[in-house]
UniProtKB/Swiss-Prot annotation:
The gene is trpA. Its EC number is 4.2.1.20. It comes from the Bacteria. It is an enzyme of class 4 (lyase). This is Tryptophan synthase alpha chain.
Amino acid sequence: MSRLQTRFDQLKEQNRAALVTFVTAGDPGYDTSLAILKGLPAAGADVIELGMPFTDPMADGPAIQLANIRALEAKQNLLKTLQMVREFRKGNNDTPLVLMGYFNPIHKYGVPKFIADAKEAGVDGLIVVDMPPEHNGELCDPAQAAGIDFIRLTTPTTDDVRLPTVLNGSSGFVYYVSVAGVTGAGAATLEHVEEAVARLRRHTDLPISIGFGIRTPEQAAAIARLADGVVVGSALIDHIANAKNDQQAIDGVLGLCAALSEGVRNASV
């Protein structure tokens, strides 16, 4: 059984959602990024998404775009990102770790070599935002054959006709991205999420995680009552962007992670 399935199964038994945290590898530099990565599980992260820096992250908002720039300026590349995973695994063999990004760096690295190296490093899953299911044979199928989950993104515009195609070959969990980020989890917004989760559950038995512009423990708790996972990225990355030094970046990210985790754990599912 994969680390992802094990973790979601454990949390289901505890009747709570997973806190899924996203940070960009190498932001603001390798050592600080690794310290953040190593600290996330103890701060309450149940699943970690680690961004693979890319020069043209077209599907990401301003905060993550800037994180990519900072990481690339610090000379982060895919080789170093996999090394970071290896370093993380030396002290943590339980927390699922998913690489998220775009196909171009993987293509340049070489798909067979990437899959072999990712598996050896301890990567559990991939989210590759510009690889539609029509191209499953290029990356999704060989990754899954090696035991690496391939996680699909769905959005409010993914209709019932398209959903089965998108979910075909998906594993690990489904990542639902609400394209309209929120500043406060209002009732209408939560109603929209509840409807989206119900619609997805008609099409898949996989856990459903929501990425939602979540910034506060209260928002995290509200989403945790509706879904299997709560994804937080930009709010964590903002602490790196606004930090005056590396230690402040580490403390800011891990402090917010702990607060979000408390919100998720206190939510009654």
